[in-house]
Every structure is written in C-alpha cells, then in structure tokens.
Amino acid sequence: MKQEVLFLLLNEYADWEGAFLAISLNTGVIPGSEVKYIPKVVAPTLDVVRSVGGFRTLPDYSFQTMPADYAALVLVGGMHWQSPEAELVVPIVQDALQRGKIVGAICNASAFMGAHGFLNDVKHTSNTLPYLKQFAGSA
C-alpha cells in the first residue's frame, strides 16, 4: 500500500515549489521504480486553496481531518507563512516531529520553521542567511 506524503498548503502558496517532489513521488523516485508514495494536499479547511499563480486546489484533508499515519509532511512556501493562518500549523509540525515524521519546508515555510525554533538543532537549508534572520530571527 502506498504511503501518503502530505503537502501542506496555505492560501497564496507557491504552486511551483512542490511540483518536482510531487512528480517524483507520484511516478516513482527513480523512473521505472516502484511507486511507494502518493502526494495528498492538506489545508486549513476543505475549501479551495488559491496559489500565487492563480491555481485553485481542492484539499484532500483539512487540518482537522488529516490522517495521523503518513510518511512525510511538506510545507510548501508561499506568501502567508508570517500570517495568523500559519500559526495553526505549529501544533501539526510539533506533533509530526514528536512522532519522528519527516518534515520538509520550502522557501518561506523554512523561515516559518526557523521562527518557531524547529530548525535550532538540525542541519537545514533555506533562503539566504539575511532572509532567514529577517523572518526567523534568532529563535
């Protein structure tokens, strides 16, 4: 059975940022290999989430209905990672990390992770150091 990789989207998400990972998961990490994962979308509610590019995405799960059993959580970057909406993601990330889940964050989502101290004790990449300091501070 395929394991789900949850792509967490906020409104005004960066639609291009999760694309290559989702393609690899959905078709086999190595071309022709067994497909072990399936990408699924999680958003604050089950309402349509709109991307920066204007795409409208219907989530598979809301924050309240997302499964407890999944392979990984991917926070896709976008324009709302410094918003009150993003604060709803903190307990989701805390729970994922406590349960040993893989958690990835792209672009602005990595600054969100830094701002909440999730990157303090792990090696990570992000945008430029000045950018990370601006949005994540010294958390």
Where are these regions (language model features)?
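Short, hydrophobic beta-strand segments that form beta-sheet elements in well-ordered domains
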Residues: 40-43, 103-107, 123-127
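Extended, subdomain-level signal for the structured scaffold at the beginning of enzyme domains
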Residues: 1-99, 112-121, 132-139
